[in-house]
UniProtKB/Swiss-Prot annotation:
InterPro entries: SH3-like_dom_sf, SH3_domain, SH3_domain_YSC84-like, SH3YL1_SH3, SYLF_SH3YL1-like, Ysc84_actin-binding. Residues 281-340 form the SH3 domain. This is SH3 domain-containing YSC84-like protein 1. It comes from Rattus norvegicus (Rat). Residues 224-259 are annotated as: Disordered. It comes from the Eukaryota. Residues 238-249 have a biased composition (Pro residues). SUPFAM superfamilies: SH3-domain. Interacts with SH3D19. GO terms for cellular component: ruffle membrane. GO terms for biological process: phosphatidylinositol biosynthetic process; regulation of ruffle assembly. One of its GO terms (molecular function) is phosphatidylinositol binding. Residues 226-237 have a biased composition (Basic and acidic residues).
């Protein structure tokens, strides 16, 4: 485990880079399903990396040190700000344990709360959840979660659950002053008033690698999606080439005339169409084998698996039939459905 005793910012940045590698690289102890997904860090608005010591005898006390960084508007990472963590917990625990923590700040407001106030209490106004694991995890998992903060904890080299509710991230002002050679607040550091320090080069190298991995994964997912759509398009049966056409152009309807209102409809009740179709005294039901997205007014949209009531049909399955679904009436390719 890494040293939880507070040290200078250069050492804290070096420790943070080491911890991030341990949390994100596949090893004999960390399989592909036991690493922080690249997209979680690539999409983070901020992150904190710390080493924590927990001691307990009836009541547990937690303390440690690390750094916090924020995502700048241009997508780059800010300079690091030194932080500490402190908290108390209940439960009958006896002993001492050292853990490494990675805390992901998913929303700007979580970063701002720390930057403006100089500390951030986990829980309360900010929901805390154990972060997702797994290299192949879909990138939208973090988007589906409403948690403002993700936490990852490793104890003795293994991921472990840890409750950080009520723990507080605290700004270490004196450590920042010594490193940056000026009185400077976390707010100014995290919002880009100082450049990335050369002493933290290793840290930025690994942080930038997550963005590259995420973009590579995104390209791979997009390529798979395109290939899947192309295969699906090839598998779809061709639509009938000819559509039922109106025998005359639409007439101007008189709002007060019910007979005029029924005189013209886009597809149903056209004499030229019904000469070759059969109106069904007992409507039959068909099930969609494929999804169909209409391309012209009067087409009936449906998804694979939908049940459609057939209003009128021809003897050919390679033709346009008329049906009704969810209160909508329109025509559809008959070879996209099967009889129930």
């Amino acid at each position: 485990m890494n040293n939880p005793i507070p040290s200078n910012l250069k050492s804290e940045a070096k420790k943070a880079a080491k911890i991030l590698r341990e949390f994100t690289e596949i090893t004999s102890r960390n399989g592909p399903d036991k690493i922080i997904p690249a997209h979680v860090i690539a999409k983070a608005k901020g992150l904190a990396v710390l080493s924590v010591i927990k001691a307990g005898f009836l009541v547990t006390a937690r303390g440690g040190s690390g750094i916090v960084l924020a995502r700048l508007p241009d997508g780059k990472w800010s300079a690091p700000s030194a932080i500490g963590i402190a908290g108390l917990g209940g439960g009958f625990e006896i002993g001492i344990e050292v853990s490494d923590l990675v805390i992901i700040l998913n929303y700007d407001r979580a970063v701002e709360a720390f930057a403006k106030g100089g500390n951030l209490t986990l829980g309360g106004n900010f929901t805390v959840a154990v972060g997702p694991l797994g290299r192949n995890l879909e990138g939208n998992v973090s988007l589906r979660s409403s948690a403002a903060v993700f936490t990852y904890c490793k104890s003795r080299g293994l991921f472990a659950g840890i409750s950080l509710e009520g723990s507080c991230l605290i700004e270490r002002k004196e450590t920042n002053r010594k490193f940056y050679c000026q009185d400077i607040r976390a707010y100014d550091i995290l919002f880009g008033d100082v450049p990335q320090p050369a002493q933290a080069e290793d840290l930025y190298e690994i942080l930038n690698s997550f963005t590259e991995k995420y973009e590579t994964e995104g390209q791979r997912i997009n390529l798979k999606k395109v290939a899947r759509e192309q295969r699906k398009a090839k598998e779809l049966p061709p639509k009938p080439s000819s559509r039922p056409q109106p025998s005359r152009p639409p007439v101007q309807l008189n709002a007060g005339s019910q007979s005029n209102r029924n005189e013209y409809k886009l597809y149903p009740e056209l004499s030229s169409y019904h000469e070759k179709t059969g109106s069904l005294s007992q409507p039959i039901e068909v099930t969609a084998l494929y999804s169909f997205e209409g391309q012209q007014p009067g087409d009936l949209n449906f998804q694979a698996g939908d049940r459609i009531i057939v209003i009128s049909k021809t003897d050919s399955n390679f033709d346009w039939w008329e049906g009704k679904l969810r209160g909508q009436t329109g025509i559809f390719p008959a070879n996209y459905v099967t009889m129930n």
